[in-house]
């Protein structure tokens, strides 16, 4: 009887060790943006914490945000729509529009942080060519940062918004752990094609066609909030992605040898003049 109980205890301990090991492996994988398994991108899985339950910290002033009348990821920013200009020292500027109606928490969080100077002076601590560039951590280590509420907030995922090339997404360490870190997808069409061929995520034919045409990283679909899209500056994105990198201390060659610094983020409104986008602050 004692031997049986001891055997059972030993078996339980062995199982627990396996569970802990698996949990640690999953945690390590999800800490790296794009390594976690993607969810079904063909379904609308939008989920957001009720904002009334969260209070913006008093140190942040929320800017006026004007949303686009219609959510269209690849359309030009419309007149009066809120946009951001991200000036990267030595590289140039990138501009982004936002999807307030589909990702209100992520958009409000990002624009508030940007307008309060939170991102100014921060670095792109993680750069992987043909994948993405990541920033939003004041410590520059990939382990810091906070939301305007001082706590994590939920993912906001919908089938209309995909991790296409130029998409602005929230970085996380697992579902519903969004803070201040973000990444910009840089992968081009050939990389997207390889990703689709691997078949790691279920996508509709329309979604697949968008990846093949625009580029992006299919396996990220459903696991990360897409809350913005680049409207200008793809050449800057590619230049940053092509910078020389080194081991980040964890075995991943993703840390820029020379710091890539966000000099300034400016929140403004878009204007269309003769079909060309210009910024009016």
Regions from the PLM with identified roles:
Residues 7-10, 27, 39-40, 45:
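Intrinsically disordered, low-complexity serine/threonine-rich segments
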Residues 5, 23-25, 50:
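Short stretches within intrinsically disordered, low-complexity N-terminal or propeptide regions
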Residues 17-37:
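Sec-dependent N-terminal signal peptides of Gram-positive bacterial secreted proteins and lipoproteins
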Residues 1-15:
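Short, Lys/Arg-enriched N-terminal segments with co-localized hydrophobic residues
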Residues 2, 27-30, 55:
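Position-driven detector of the extreme protein N-terminus
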Residues 35-281:
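Cyclophilin-like peptidyl-prolyl cis-trans isomerases
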